[in-house]
């Protein structure tokens, strides 16, 4: 979230997973309890940042609508909402990346939760796409992220044909079907 009159510079991005590990290590508690504390502290920091008119960002799977109220509060306080939405084009790839993360010491997530979160993230994205002032959407399925879509105000620009889940989120956000024309035709 960025105050409308600010320029974008350094933005504190809160990563819940890294914060939970830090809490677990420094407060000598299990990771499950540390995750809960991280979520509670992040929510408090985000609202405190809005109250202090301080730009802040948060990384989220977007599998719940919990940040909607924060966005509404920030907008009511003059913030411009900027969103980066990064997805993988298939939940199988999400499952594989979690396996790799676990193999390198990261935390596990049950496969059924990964798959359910993939679907819910697109469902929730529709609301944030509609409400955000600026949105950049990237597909991170390959070796390099690819920009798929941008939104500036009410204008959407597609750089590639969206996957069905993204197309449905856009349709849900704006209430109409998309027609895609290849730019090379």
Q: What are the functions of these language-model segments?
A:
Residues 26, 70-73, 97:
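Residue-level signal for well-ordered alpha-helical positions
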Residues 77-125:
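A glycine- and Lys/Arg-enriched "phosphate-lid" helix/loop adjacent to the NTP-binding pocket
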Residues 129-185:
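NTP-dependent small-molecule kinase module
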Residues 34-88, 121, 136:
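Glycine-rich phosphate-binding loop used to anchor ATP phosphates in small-molecule kinases
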Residues 28-29, 96-100, 149-154:
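Short, surface-exposed amphipathic charged segments that create phosphate/polyanion-binding patches used
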Residues 10, 78-80, 131-132:
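A generic structural signal for alpha->beta connector loops
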Residues 2-54:
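Conserved substrate/cofactor phosphate-moiety recognition/catalytic segment
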Residues 18-20, 63, 87-93, 142-144:
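Conserved nucleotide-binding/hydrolysis micro-motifs of P-loop NTPases
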């Amino acid at each position: 979230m960025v105050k409308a009159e600010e320029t974008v510079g350094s933005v504190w991005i809160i990563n819940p997973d890294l914060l939970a590990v830090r809490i677990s290590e420094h407060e000598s508690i299990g990771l499950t309890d540390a995750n809960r504390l991280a979520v509670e502290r992040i929510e408090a920091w985000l609202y405190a940042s809005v109250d202090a008119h301080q730009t802040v960002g948060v990384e989220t799977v977007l599998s719940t609508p919990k940040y909607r109220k924060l966005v509404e509060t920030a907008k009511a306080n003059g913030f411009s909402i900027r969103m980066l939405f990064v997805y993988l084009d298939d939940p199988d790839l999400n499952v594989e990346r979690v396996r790799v993360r676990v193999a390198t010491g990261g935390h596990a997530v049950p496969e059924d939760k990964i798959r359910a979160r993939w679907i819910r993230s697109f469902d929730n994205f529709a609301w944030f796409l509609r409400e955000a002032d600026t949105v950049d959407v990237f597909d991170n399925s390959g070796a390099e992220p690819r920009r798929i879509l941008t939104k500036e105000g009410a204008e959407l620009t597609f750089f590639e044909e969206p996957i069905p889940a993204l197309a449905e989120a856009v349709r849900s956000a704006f209430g109409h079907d998309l027609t895609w024309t290849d730019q090379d035709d």
